[in-house]
């Protein structure tokens, strides 16, 4: 007889009672929502300071309730549905984009597995659940979120959202390859895909020190994955009006914005877990304070690291301009993927040497990391060198402006002139020709005037 699912061994998901699992799930949801509300206000404040402005200062103390006011405003706005839209897919797209953004936090550890805290008299770990393949789960969930953006662009029945959805699909596919290679190097060095085990393996040195190239690659790819500046091509208002969410309003638009900021928090939490020691206290504190990694303190260190990475997102938005789409694809396919593959091979080689008890493995890893960082900088320098050569090249004569090149007339842009319009030759003076021909004598006077009677 086939056993039921309830009879299977589900101990890998934890041994907490169902009500405690619900409490921890609600805590994870509340953590994401509070962090998002704070991050929106923090972003507007930081960008305002960069631009010598005040920023939000009306709702709540120091404008801290501005995000809540914006959310209520969006919920009370009129919800419009485009007539040409595929209504079922149009409504489901924001949900498909928002739900996967919340799911990845389930396997992120907020504290050590052996440091159980007491919740209503029950001892439990500071993590919703831990899986042996937790990082593969995060990759799978992150890949599902792209469907919401693509479906939103396709179902809107408009050109601009469709182009934004296609851009987002191509961008995320391009950058997930390099992200997967960065993850693989961490798996090779830690020997596990479990998030709690990866944090435990960083007890002496964080992976940002051992795997610096993987950290740089992941930082670049996480900005591309979240469609944030300077890689926010799917929603560039300069050429796509509003991008994939142009035709959305009210609560549906708010769900897309919520998904974007929740993704920022999620990728920052993943980066903290993989490269920054997770919940572990920073190096100076952990050396003289033994209790820094016990109790509720690990959650404080984790939140501080996540907030620093969120500030990095904000700093990028306030300082860097949006790159062109061809530059974005060139960076992903010609720089990040080759560097990540070479670095992964080097990490695998060093890991093999360490298993054979070679002493120079760490030295080779550091040297290889430095070499790849130099290669990455050389790639970026080549890009700027080509741009400077193009700027220094003598300007060619611009092609003549053709107002009908696109099939319909368009006005000239500044600096363009309309070509001269061909005119007919001026008409010659007409000669008076009588009906009988030029050789026929006319009955009238020679000057063409009629004779009078007197």
UniProtKB/Swiss-Prot annotation:
Q: What function does the entry list?
A: NDH-1 shuttles electrons from NADH, via FMN and iron-sulfur (Fe-S) centers, to quinones in the respiratory chain. The immediate electron acceptor for the enzyme in this species is believed to be ubiquinone. Couples the redox reaction to proton translocation (for every two electrons transferred, four hydrogen ions are translocated across the cytoplasmic membrane), and thus conserves the redox energy in a proton gradient. This subunit may bind ubiquinone.
Q: What is this protein called?
A: NADH-quinone oxidoreductase subunit H
The processes (GO biological process) annotated in the record are: aerobic respiration
Top-level taxon of the source organism:
Bacteria
Cited Pfam families: NADHdh
One Gene Ontology cellular component: plasma membrane
What ranges does the record list as Pro residues composition bias?
409-421
Is the keyword Membrane in the record?
Answer: yes
Question: Which UniProt keywords are given for this protein, alphabetically ordered?
Answer: Cell membrane, Membrane, NAD, Quinone, Translocase, Transmembrane, Transmembrane helix, Ubiquinone
The subunit structure is: NDH-1 is composed of 14 different subunits. Subunits NuoA, H, J, K, L, M, N constitute the membrane sector of the complex.
Q: What catalytic activity does the UniProt entry give for this protein? A: a quinone + NADH + 5 H(+)(in) = a quinol + NAD(+) + 4 H(+)(out)
Residue ranges of the region described as Disordered: 395-454
Subcellular location(s) per record: Cell membrane
Where do transmembrane segments lie in this chain? 18-38, 88-108, 131-151, 172-192, 206-226, 256-276, 296-316, 328-348, 360-380
Q: Which PANTHER family match?
A: NADH DEHYDROGENASE SUBUNIT 1, NADH-UBIQUINONE OXIDOREDUCTASE CHAIN 1
Q: How does it sit in the membrane?
A: Multi-pass membrane protein
Q: Tell me its family.
A: Belongs to the complex I subunit 1 family.
Predominant cellular place of this UniProt entry's protein: membrane
UniProt EC number = 7.1.1.-
What molecular function does GO assign, one term? Answer: oxidoreductase activity, acting on NAD(P)H, quinone or similar compound as acceptor
Q: Which gene encodes it?
A: nuoH
List the source organism: Streptomyces avermitilis (strain ATCC 31267 / DSM 46492 / JCM 5070 / NBRC 14893 / NCIMB 12804 / NRRL 8165 / MA-4680)
